[in-house]
């Protein structure tokens, strides 16, 4: 049993991963993963692309394994989860395994840790961030990134917990995209997501999406950012396909 002094807040062991890309026929694929998480973590965060094609059948297969979790599970969706246009059905299947899906809102663990989550979106980084100028389609693309940033801002603004973490699918910084083909980096995230993070603060940010990116970076304000895409973790820490952080 972990002991704390009167003035300390209990440490929460957060396991985080993303980009599971579960397919309909992959029954039992995540059974050992769930067993491992149960042994070492207090809460599990799934950072998008839970399914490969966004079908309810894929979500049902994943939920079969996640149902064995003995700890809370919180998720955001990724771009793959929207592919089939069945996001409500996907959400319903995951709810059967008590997965809490965030979309611009938050989850609170034992009044100590607040989790703010949204999918995020693309748009580029720093001085190369795409601006809302020109064609209507360009403006709509930029506005989607702005909307996701505002959703994250709202989620963080609602939290009054002593500790906060952020979960996204898309990256809020360019550093964790390094290693990807340079031409696709503007589609892996946007700096707009980092603005509410630096304004409200967080202990750590988790994201996925960047299968060939880098493991870690920081926002301009110094908040730690971890890329927890499972394909990347499979290469760097094959025996533990999730990040484990004490907050």
Question: Which stretches of residues belong to each language-model region?
Answer:
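N-terminal active-site segment of His-dependent metallophosphoesterases
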Residues: 1-71, 82-85, 138, 142-143, ...
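Binuclear metal-dependent phosphoesterase catalytic core
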Residues: 2, 10-11, 88, 109, ...
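Structural motif
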Residues: 12-14, 42-43, 113-114, 163-165, ...
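Active-site neighborhood of phospho(di)ester-bond hydrolases with catalytic His/Asp-centered motifs
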Residues: 16-18, 44-49, 73-79, 100-105, ...
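Conserved catalytic scaffold of divalent metal-dependent phosphoesterases
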Residues: 20-22, 88-187, 229-230
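Metal-dependent catalytic neighborhoods of phosphoester/phosphodiester hydrolases
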Residues: 26-29, 50-67, 77, 82-97, ...
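Short, well-ordered alpha-helix to beta-strand connector turns
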Residues: 41, 70, 98, 161-162, ...
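Cap/insert and terminal regions of metallo-dependent hydrolase folds
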Residues: 62-66, 171-200
